[in-house]
Amino acid sequence: MRPKHLAMALSKLTPHPCADVTLEQYATEGDLAAYWMLAVDQLDGLEGHRVVDLGAGNGILGIAALMLGAEHVVFVEADDDAETVLQHNISGLDDALSKRATVLKAHIGADDLTLDRPDI
């Protein structure tokens, strides 16, 4: 996928609500997410890999991984508002992508996370 097309698709996602500074929430713009995930793809090749998006926010990085061919993405998010946006963004994907996504509501470091050997 071309960087411009990936950036445009990611820019259409509902943005992260960024309401809780105690969770160190930051929004990632579509252009940055696209170039970052394309760099990861060039280094490790996302196609066929299992990815975990910790502190997923609106899901922009994990969704990019799905668009670049990741086999499955587990999105981990603790914030209720961000999880709502994340679920909305995943539901807006076509079925071929959304069925390869799992959302876990968990606080990293506080909740017990069982992840099935992610690659990335």
Whereabouts are the PLM-identified features?
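Conserved Rossmann-like nucleotide-cofactor binding loop
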Residues: D81
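Short SAM/SAH-binding signature in class I
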Residues: P118-I120
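Conserved class I S-adenosyl-L-methionine
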Residues: H49-G57
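S-adenosyl-L-methionine
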Residues: M1-R50, V85-D116
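Active-site catalytic pocket residues across diverse enzymes, especially alpha/beta-hydrolases
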Residues: V40, G69, I90, D94
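Conserved SAM-binding motif I beta-strand of class I
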Residues: H72-E77
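Conserved SAM-binding loop of SAM-dependent methyltransferases across substrates and taxa
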Residues: N58-A70
